[in-house]
Curated annotation (Swiss-Prot):
Mg(2+) 1 binds at residues 316, 320. Sesquiterpene synthase that catalyzes the formation of germacrene A. Can use farnesyl diphosphate as substrate, but not geranyl diphosphate or geranylgeranyl diphosphate. Beta-elemene, the initially measured product in the assay, is derived nonenzymatically from germacrene A. One of its GO terms (molecular function) is magnesium ion binding. This is Germacrene-A synthase. Its cofactor is Mg(2+). It comes from Humulus lupulus (European hop).
Amino acid sequence: MSTQIFASSSQNEKIHKILRPTKKLQPSVWGERFLHYNISEQELRYKQQQVEELKAVVKKEIFGESAYDVSHQLKLINVVERLGLSYHFESEIENELESIYNKSVDQNYILKDENLHDASLRFRLLRQHGFRVSSADIFEKFKDEDGNFKECLVSDTIGLLSLYEASHLSCVGENILDEALDFTTTHLTEFLANKKEHDDPLSKEISQALERPLRKSLERLAARHFISIYANETSHNKVLLQLAKLDFNLLQSIHKKELSEISRWWKESDFVHKFPFARDRIVELYLWILAVYYEPQYYLARNILTKTIALASIADDIYDEYGTIEELELLTEAVERWDINFIDKLNPEYLQTFYKELLNSYEEFEQALSKEETYRVHYAKERFKELLRSSLEVAWWLKEGRVPSFDEYLKISLINCGYHMLIVSSLIGMKGSIVTKEVFEWLSIDRKIVRASVTICRLMDDIAEYKFEQEKNEEPSAVECYMKQYGVSEEEAYDELNKRVVNAWKEINEELLKPTGVASPILVRALNFSKFMDLFYKNGDGYTQVGKVTKHSVAALLIHPIP
């Protein structure tokens, strides 16, 4: 960490020197690559027309035929979802799965000859869509008299992979799925170790799954990966494959156009020069929000949420890296008041600049909404205020050189990670009747699914920074606080925190089972935020230090179309 000295004028105009700690920042790796993207409305409409025509064919071929048996229909649904096409056929998929679920419940539907792959696929798809199916009822028959998974399953590699994916839909206390995860991970790893070449489709699928199972994968990245695998399957459905490629490239064009608009906003706002101490990551931030919702109808929501997280990122760097405690107290008070007339009390100038940008942005959010929707911005403001209050608490810990207890740390840092604010803010621009005042009130209480997503964010971020960063952060982290409170080693702290992350994923799975407290499209935002953490923070801080995973993800979704 280096230091810089700045001259700053206080309110009584007395000049004093401020020692500001600063990290050496990695500049944006993208430059102005995404600033200009030109695609005509005519070209977009043509692509959309092609997709619509193929959608009609697929709907008739796949969802219009009732003669398929359950196994075949589940496999078709799985292919449609993994190709990234499920958002086109939501009602059809839901109806099919509800029919399968009702058979399971009403007719004690147990297929004695159902193999491991089919049983695992049925379980995963039903759980994925919120149906409460019993893991014990489905998987107990694959165990031997000693309660272990049968050894004969080891040779069923496809079945093992399917069970592995299903095990990631487990809820708290489902021991059989914990055992399934251990069993499949061991034998799938051995399968790869015993192969000299990993170029065949199955080996590629297994490698990808072991790195990141479907439940934790960004839908668009997983779709891009699977499209290439599916294309090499001899029995692939040509219409489905063609639709998947066209749809992927159409969405990419839409997203590139949006990113171009967002990049212009970032450049015209001149944030890089106004806040030279802040991370220049607008492309990565757009990718973050693309993980939350990629569907075309969420254009406004993406625009608002990308700007929100960009402002939050600047605020994070102000509180963590740049501001003095006196400046941070002033800024926190100003944001609490949310009154432009307070701006003259802010010094130095960068505080005024940030405050003005913040208030103007939220005013623009209101203007982008209908009159009946403007109430939503109030809830987002309250969460942003809460975020800065927690950031000030953390700044005081740093100033005092204090390492809080783990319990005290979590109380503040779960707010400070920003995910509660972002989950609430993700609803501002969402159209439709499911987003209501009651939903915002529901989210204002400490809900389990929100807390679980926030826990994943906080702990994965802290582990990544503490474990992988050469330059240790001076502010307290979950790792350090846990070591202090419980008197354990660094590795023991990692183990415990990782267990909490695993448990949080199980809580998310449980909260998404029907009936849910609010509509599923609301809750799934928490799931999608968590998926992004697994991508960017599993092996380091992929946001601050843009590396291979980040570059690959941006290239796959926002640069290279599928040929």
